[in-house]
């Protein structure tokens, strides 16, 4: 048993069933660890994470709510992202969107 692991009587739980996903390779080019939470707009993560930010626009990590992925210095890992749902509005983070993700499809500012 893994700490925090849950056993249920029903079928397996599938996270974000039916939503579009994307698999990306991410490289931490920083000299410190970077941790990204489950609902953080992935395109707006720390600039020291190297990956295709345009492809990640409007997506977050496809992991359980309240969890995170940690990228150690120099580490490269593959992550799965999932589309935001609902109204698809993003505010805060690095301030690169500040509104609807789908507004003309070009609400994403430069992230370098």
From Swiss-Prot:
Localization, UniProt: Cytoplasm
One Gene Ontology biological process: urea catabolic process
Enzyme Commission no: 3.5.1.5
An MF annotation (GO) of this entry: urease activity
Catalyzed chemical reaction(s): urea + 2 H2O + H(+) = hydrogencarbonate + 2 NH4(+)
Family affiliation: Belongs to the urease beta subunit family.
Subunit structure: Heterotrimer of UreA (gamma), UreB (beta) and UreC (alpha) subunits. Three heterotrimers associate to form the active enzyme.
Designated name of the protein: Urease subunit beta
Native source species: Polaromonas sp. (strain JS666 / ATCC BAA-500)
């Amino acid at each position: 048993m893994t700490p925090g692991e849950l056993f249920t009587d029903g079928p397996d739980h599938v996270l974000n069933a039916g939503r579009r996903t994307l698999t990306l390779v991410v490289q931490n080019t920083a000299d410190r660890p970077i941790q990204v939470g489950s609902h953080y707009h992935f395109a707006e993560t720390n600039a020291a994470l190297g990956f295709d930010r345009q492809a990640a626009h409007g997506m977050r990590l496809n992991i359980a709510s309240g969890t995170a992925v940690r990228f150690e210095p120099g580490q490269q890992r593959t992550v799965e992202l999932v589309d935001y749902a609902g109204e698809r509005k993003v505010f805060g983070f690095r301030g690169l969107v500040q509104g609807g993700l789908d507004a003309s499809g070009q609400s994403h500012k430069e992230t370098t």
